[in-house]
Amino acid sequence: MSTDNDRAQYLRGALYGLMAVVIWSGWIVVARLGLRTSLTPWDIAALRFGVAGVLLVPYLARKGIAVERLGWSGLAAIVLGGAAPVFLANFGLKFAPAAHAGALFPGVMPLFVALLAAAFLQEDFTKSKKLGFALIMPGVVAIAWGPGESLASSQNIGDVFFLAAGLAWAFYTIAMRKARLGGLHAAAISAVGSMLIYLPVFAFMPGTTLASVSWTDVALQAIVQGVLTAILSLMLYGRAVSILGASSGAAFAALCPAMTALLAIPILGEWPTPIEWGAISLISAGVYVVSGGPLSWSKR
């Protein structure tokens, strides 16, 4: 890429990716807050799938499930790859802090996407991508296990959930890119499919606390989970992937640990340590390189 048009395309894709990152970072904080109430991971998943599924049924009825483009395996990757991370991340948050979620779910997911894209989409794992990931990974580790963090066994359980969530999301990304689905179309297939599969099971599940939780807590989760995260962020993410490619578009997710740390300043009054500021700088530089920033175009 070297023309002004290419630069404009990159900036458009980067803007979509950055907006998605802001929503994802907020989702991690809000999900953690929800789990501090009597809401369970099952309740939060029901709110996400129920709200998003109902809102997107009319759109999916017009567009269809695109099985001719996805194939049955691709359809399964979209539905399950969109649903599984919700459960995996929410259960992980029961064991490990939000910083680990941000670092190991969206933070490591771009590496999974790059490896799968090289295998299934023939996207080159270029020198610039290798350099970018070499910058991102130390930053992710520094935020997750910096000073004051430990490798407690219970946290390790949560970390495994977060990594599994990232891998599931990577399969969603590859299926969407391979079928060239729009972000909203993929979000609709995932949301409606998840709603049809999950809500009948949830209706007979013991231990739900939705009826006893304050309406403000329920409304917050419904809006953030069902509208912002399950619909808007997937639209933005899909646009970034369609413009920049699977691995380059997904690279913006690695900014989530840094964005979460920055959001914690005004929301939680938690200031990053000097090491975390350094990690934020490393991650930001790595994402810029992997995503195809102008200075790396000549090396791709």
Q: How would you label these PLM feature ranges?
A:
Residues 34, 44, 48, 92, ...:
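Hydrophobic/aromatic residues within transmembrane alpha-helices
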Residues 11-16, 42-58, 72-76, 130-138, ...:
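Hydrophobic alpha-helical transmembrane segments of multi-pass integral membrane proteins
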Residues 20-28, 57-106, 114, 142, ...:
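Specific transmembrane alpha-helical segments of multi-pass solute transporters/efflux pumps
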Residues 43-54, 81, 90-124, 165, ...:
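Specific alpha-helical transmembrane segments that line the substrate/conduction pathway
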Residues 56, 77, 128-147, 198, ...:
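Hydrophobic transmembrane alpha-helices of multi-pass small-molecule transport proteins
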Residues 29-38, 94, 144-155, 203-222, ...:
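Membrane-interface helix termini and inter-helical loops of multi-pass transporters
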Residues 1-45, 148-178, 196-197, 263, ...:
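Glycine-/small-residue-enriched transmembrane alpha-helix faces in small-molecule transporters
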Residues 47, 86, 101-108, 175-196, ...:
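Helix-helix packing/entry segments at the starts of transmembrane helices
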